[in-house]
Curated annotation (Swiss-Prot):
Gene3D superfamilies: Rhodopsin 7-helix transmembrane proteins. This is Relaxin-3 receptor 1. Keywords: Cell membrane, Disulfide bond, G-protein coupled receptor, Glycoprotein, Membrane, Receptor, Transducer, Transmembrane, Transmembrane helix. It is a multi-pass membrane protein. Glycans are attached at residues 36, 40. One of its GO terms (molecular function) is G protein-coupled peptide receptor activity. Receptor for RNL3/relaxin-3. Binding of the ligand inhibit cAMP accumulation. Residues 103-119, 178-215, 292-329, 378-469 are cytoplasmic. It comes from Homo sapiens (Human).
């Protein structure tokens, strides 16, 4: 890592003893590592820069870090820290509420028993729920100027849980994309398979082999996420930096003949490749193949004068293609936009650790100000996942409306969760509640509360949603 030229190093050696300076100088990679782990300690860098008395890259005299304005800069950094802490608490609250709601709906509707996709959604909600539980620790750390008050054991636990659930969340998103492609492609492959696991390889029986395969895949995903988080579990520790205790990942000075910089670069390379590049590539590939497959089936059905998807008109195929395209846009863009800034800055740090590019003032300022914002954006994906993968689906919106109405009006107990004109998606057909038995003749419109219509015969329906599709 190139932090100063030869003249700067000579000046520093005159100002301080070599051993003491070398010790302080060696802490810079640790602070950069902490910044690249979860946004921790990134704002401690100006203090260390000032403590070392480094000459600035632009030749300015030492005494203030790059871009620093003295007390004004300190106030700005304090405001940034407080803002980040508030964002962490907001993300934590929204993530807990959203993922708990998804878990409740899945359990009450037994959705995970009906579909491998829903099994992945349940595990994704559990993963994001565990992930947001770590945010209060990072929020407190930010508010305390990145001091770690929880001890060494909690440093290891929180770091490992954060890393493991980050990997697990990305892996489950990838598994859902692959499963969605397989399900839709299998349903459209031949009309002879109609009625035998259409769009849902699990069918309705827990004994089906595909359902067991989905469960086995979930176990493998959790195991792989735990394996990927082992470096955080092993090397996370508390380190004294200028009299303050910080929680960071610190590799030994020499490990298997390699220095600390090499292992830090390898650690972050794993994060970028295994936690972003490969999953994103698989997600994009699956959705591109899915869109192309549906388009080819539509073209073949139109050319042959036959229906697409086992007797369906080409108009239905066009609507399916439109929904898939919309799903592609939402899923890929949300994942890409939330994680790209964080992973781009991490990639920059990898190049510096491998001495491919020099340490610069621009990188320093990005680590101080931009990296914490990118971490917040990446963490917000845990709030978006419940919305993107559950609540935008029609049957879950209906179930949520039913739940809210039952809470608001407990006296109405015979309300149906779905309207007579709305069919649940094929993978959850078994979730529709049976209609209540026919009752005595009643007026056509007995009662009309907001959102509910009571028809003759004792049938209670929710009003159809204008946003349903």
């Amino acid at each position: 890592m190139q932090m100063a030229d030869a003249a700067t190093i000579a000046t520093m050696n005159k100002a301080a003893g070599g051993d003491k300076l070398a010790e302080l100088f060696s802490l810079v990679p640790d602070l950069l590592e902490a910044a690249n782990t979860s946004g921790n300690a990134s704002l401690q860098l100006p203090d260390l820069w000032w403590e070392l008395g480094l000459e600035l890259p632009d030749g300015a005299p030492p005494g203030h870090p790059p871009g620093s304005g003295g007390a004004e800069s300190a106030d700005t950094e304090a405001r940034v820290r407080i803002l980040i802490s508030v964002v962490y608490w907001v993300v934590c609250a929204l993530g807990l509420a959203g993922n708990l709601l998804v878990l409740y709906l899945m359990k009450s509707m037994q959705g995970w028993r009906k579909s491998s996709i829903n099994l992945f959604v349940t595990n994704l909600a559990l993963t994001d729920f565990q992930f947001v539980l770590t945010l209060p620790f990072w929020a407190v750390e930010n508010a305390l100027d990145f001091k770690w008050p929880f001890g060494k054991a909690m440093c290891k636990i929180v770091s490992m849980v954060t890393s493991m659930n980050m990997y697990a969340s990305v892996f489950f998103l990838t598994a859902m994309s692959v499963t969605r492609y397989h399900s839709v492609a299998s349903a459209l492959k031949s009309h002879r398979t109609r009625g035998h696991g259409r769009g849902d390889c699990c069918g309705r029986s827990l004994g089906d082999s595909c359902c067991f395969s989905a469960k086995a895949l979930c176990v493998w995903i959790w195991a792989l996420a735990a394996l990927a988080s082992l470096p955080s579990a092993i090397f996370s520790t508390t380190v004294k930096v200028m009299g303050e205790e910080l929680c960071l990942v610190r590799f030994p000075d020499k490990l298997l003949g390699r220095d600390r910089q090499f292992w830090l670069g390898l650690y972050h390379s794993q994060k970028v490749l295994l936690g972003f590049v490969l999953p994103l590539g698989i997600i994009i590939l699956c959705y591109l193949l899915l869109v192309r497959f549906i388009a080819d089936r539509r073209a073949a059905g139109t050319k042959g004068g036959a229906a697409v998807a086992g007797g369906r008109p080409t108009g239905a195929s066009a609507r399916r293609l439109s929904k898939v395209t919309k799903s592609v846009t939402i899923v890929v863009l949300s994942f890409f936009l939330c994680w790209l800034p964080n992973q781009a800055l991490t990639t920059w740090s990898i190049l510096i650790k491998f001495n491919a590019v020099p340490f610069s003032q621009e990188y320093f300022l990005c680590q101080v100000y931009a990296f914490p914002v990118s971490v917040c954006l990446a963490h917000s994906n845990s709030c978006l996942n419940p919305v993107l993968y559950c609540l935008v689906r029609r049957e879950f919106r209906k179930a949520l409306k039913s739940l809210l109405w039952r809470i608001a009006s407990p006296s109405i107990t015979s309300m149906r969760p779905f309207t007579a004109t709305t069919k649940p998606e094929h993978e959850d057909q078994g979730l529709q509640a049976p209609a209540p038995p026919h009752a005595a003749a009643e007026p056509d419109l007995l009662y009309y509360p907001p959102g509910v219509v009571v028809y003759s015969g004792g049938r209670y329906d929710l009003l159809p949603s204008s946003s349903a599709y």
